[in-house]
Every structure is written in structure tokens, then in C-alpha cells.
Amino acid sequence: MKAYLDLMRHVLDNGTDKSDRTGTGTRSVFGYQMRFDLGKGFPLLTTKKLHLRSIIHELLWFLKGDTNIKYLKDNNVSIWDEWADENGDLGPVYGYQWRNWPAPDGRHIDQIANVLEQIKKNPDSRRLIVSAWNPALVDEMALPPCHALFQFYVADGKLSCQLYQRSADIFLGVPFNIASYALLTMMMAQVCGLEAGEFVHTFGDAHLYRNHFEQAALQLEREPRALPVMKINPEVKDLFAFKFEDFELEGYDPHPHIKAAVSV
């Protein structure tokens, strides 16, 4: 995944050193874009090993509309532990906004179901959008959404997705985000009877934390390997019926994992 390494190198070479909410400090750029052709392999980073189980379970958790980490803990996924309260709650984060966006009249809007219906009925629509950024509820969220809004696009029988990510932790978060939204695009395409097209990743503040510089330099020394292939159970035609066992990754041969601290 040369595109990811190019982003990392660009930030190290051209970024601006800034302070941040966590007190760690970052080097960042504003405005950047990467594109991944999902017909050329599954964009799971090969220059360090990623925990695919966490990526899949987190996505399934989002799609359930869940905002308590119990499901994640039950499946040995700890990526949200630092932000949950004593009861495991995170407030109205991604899953709530995706599946239960509160309307002023008391209704709750299922954005994912609505977009699915529109892709099938009106694929040329320019309103195939899901937003997790709800200004009225941001202060109630344990962590305001970093991957804030995504849009689908249908052309030539293929479904593509563009994500706008307002804040991007390049070393730890972005590899997960790429794989998660690529997988979501593939799942959406399957249940809509389409092929997967491109995943387009657009950033606002893309940053490397200062305590990740050494790890980034190590990763930049590694040569990317061939991308793996993600096999999805073709029998599943309901987006909300997918289970962890419906996904099988083939040909993943990454370089070793690189440890790095999370800034909370």
C-alpha cells in the first residue's frame, strides 16, 4: 500500500508541528486524499501486521447501532476500552448516529437502511450519504467522530465510497479506517447486487503523533507486499445479517506488528 506510506512520508517531510488535545503533540497536514481500487485486492496494510478481528467486529458493532463495549469485550476487542465509562457506555457515538439519528419530531432515522434502499432504487442519487457528526450530541459522545461522513456512488455496476475523516491518527487509526470502510463498501455492494469499486479516503487534519515518529520511520523502511483477498460469504444478502464467520482473508503476509502508544 504505497499510497499509505506516501501519506506518512508527506506528513513527516512537509507537516506542521502542532499541539493537540491529548498533550502529545503532532505533525500534521490539512487536506489529503488516497484512492484504493477494491478490485485489486483488500487494502489491509502489509508493512505491519494488523488485527483484522478487531476491524471486523468493530464494523459489525457499528452496524448493530451498538454503543456499549460489551459486544467488543465478548469478542476480545479492546480498541474502545480507554473511552468507555464504568458501565461500558460511550454515549451516542457512531452506531447510534448511523442507525438511530434522532429527529426533532421524536423519530429516529436509520441512515444505513435509508442509503441501502436508495442505492437499490435510485443509484444515481447524489444524496447517498451517512453522517456521524451530530452537533447537538457531540458533547455527549466519549469521542466525537473522527470518520465523520461518507458517501456512496454507483457507476458501471460498481459501488464506490468516499469517506471524509476530520481527524486522522495516521499510524494507529488510519490503517483500521481504510480496511473498515473498504469492507463496508464490499458488503454494501454485495447486498445491492453490485461489484465493489473504489474506496476514496479524504482527510481534514491528518497527523502523526510525536511518539509515533520512530515507528513511522521503521515502517517506511519496509517494502509493501501483495495485498490479500477478502472472501465474503456470497449467501448473505442482508447487510445486518453478516457475522464474523462470513469473512475470510486469503494471502495476508504482512511484516511484523509495530507497537505504539494510544493518545487518549
Swiss-Prot record:
According to its UniProt entry, the protein's GO biological process terms are:
dTMP biosynthetic process; dTTP biosynthetic process; methylation
Query: Looking at its record, which EC class is this enzyme?
Result: transferase
- For the ligand (dUMP), the binding residues are 21, 126-127, 166-169, 177, 207-209
- Any one GO MF annotation of this record: thymidylate synthase activity
Alphabetical keyword list: Cytoplasm, Methyltransferase, Nucleotide biosynthesis, Transferase
Q: Which Pfam families match?
A: Thymidylat_synt
The free-text function statement in the UniProt record for this protein reads: Catalyzes the reductive methylation of 2'-deoxyuridine-5'-monophosphate (dUMP) to 2'-deoxythymidine-5'-monophosphate (dTMP) while utilizing 5,10-methylenetetrahydrofolate (mTHF) as the methyl donor and reductant in the reaction, yielding dihydrofolate (DHF) as a by-product. This enzymatic reaction provides an intracellular de novo source of dTMP, an essential precursor for DNA biosynthesis.
Q: Which family does it belong to?
A: Belongs to the thymidylate synthase family. Bacterial-type ThyA subfamily.
- The protein depicted here goes by the name Thymidylate synthase
Q: What is the lineage of its organism?
A: Bacteria, Pseudomonadati, Pseudomonadota, Betaproteobacteria, Neisseriales
Q: Gene name, please?
A: thyA
